[in-house]
Amino acid sequence: MRPEAQTGHLPVSQSPAVHLPVLYTQVLEGLRVIENGRYLDGTFGRGGHARGVLTQLGPEGRLLVMDKDPEAIAVAERDFAPDPRVSIFRGSFAQLLQWDATAEGLDGVLFDLGVSSPQLDVAERGFSFGKDGPLDMRMDPDSGESAAQWINRVEEREIADVLWTYGEERQSRRIARAIVARREKQPFSRTAELAELIASVMPRGKDKIHPATRSFQAIRIHINRELADLEAGLDAAVERLKPGGRLAVISFHSLEDRIVKQYMNRLAKAPPANRRLPEAVAFVPTLDLIGGAIKATDEELAANPRARSAVLRVAQKREADA
């Protein structure tokens, strides 16, 4: 029986204007939602996946939603707070252990990594090189320094290291040198200024992506501590999962996916034996992998080109005696 028949209210998932998020069907299949379960959406965004979970929860089920972005939390409070099954927390999923509501354990956890479409589409958020706006890039605009503050402050070497480490940008040193030379004349304040500068110093090639793509990605990841938060969030999620609970993670670039894949493999598979080392304690797996890398179907890609780089990985926490 669906929630509306049991709780007397129409769930937010019934809104006809809702656009399905990336890998919607695959996420719900991966989480394997049970009616009375407790689930955490650690990256609420605009609530697309959360709506799907709610359609499969009964009146005793619970959905906990988190997001760093105050605009996302405002949407959650507007559209989801009236539902008694929903609890809302503003913060990074790396902080989920600090939320008392997670202490009872979770039957499923979802992380949909990276920047959301609303963040990219609104120029004032400062994430997009294609739309001029303040050079900000913070997912939580009330916390930390903006991209402009960082890029106008740090040394050339740090800029180059960030572009290489988080963007795998081969021209990182050339771009960093140009950034420092430009800011000595006039500090950066707009996304268009940075994007145009990067484009002006990049060698012409056959690459179809915008010249600033990797640099903007790298700066955004650094400003928001995305990879550090991911590592902490994975640990916290597994700690809170009940035996049999599932962890589903959507990543959008190789750096994220590599961390997720290696983390799940490390908890699911015994490391190779090394005869040079003393015999180790017997490996006890914590997770079981549920399939491999899951990608968007051709049908979804036709409707949503942004899904082309999305990769979903799912793992299940083992029973204590498994």
Curated annotation (Swiss-Prot):
Keywords noted in UniProt: Cytoplasm, Methyltransferase, rRNA processing, S-adenosyl-L-methionine, Transferase
Molecular-function annotations in GO: rRNA (cytosine-N4-)-methyltransferase activity
GO-annotated cellular components: cytoplasm
First-level EC class: transferase
Residues annotated for S-adenosyl-L-methionine binding in this entry: G47, G48, H49, D67, F93, D112, Q119
Cross-referenced Gene3D superfamilies: Putative methyltransferase TM0872, insert domain, Vaccinia Virus protein VP39
Main location: cytoplasm
Cell compartment(s), UniProt: Cytoplasm
GO annotation, biological process: rRNA base methylation
EC number: 2.1.1.199
Catalysed reactions listed for this entry: cytidine(1402) in 16S rRNA + S-adenosyl-L-methionine = N(4)-methylcytidine(1402) in 16S rRNA + S-adenosyl-L-homocysteine + H(+)
PANTHER family assigned to the protein according to its UniProt record, in alphabetical order: 12S RRNA N4-METHYLCYTIDINE METHYLTRANSFERASE, S-ADENOSYL-METHYLTRANSFERASE MRAW
HAMAP family given in the database record: 16SrRNA_methyltr_H
Matches recorded under NCBIfam families: 16S rRNA (cytosine(1402)-N(4))-methyltransferase RsmH (TIGR00006)
Protein purpose: Specifically methylates the N4 position of cytidine in position 1402 (C1402) of 16S rRNA.
Family the UniProt entry places it in: Belongs to the methyltransferase superfamily. RsmH family.
Name used for this protein in its record: Ribosomal RNA small subunit methyltransferase H
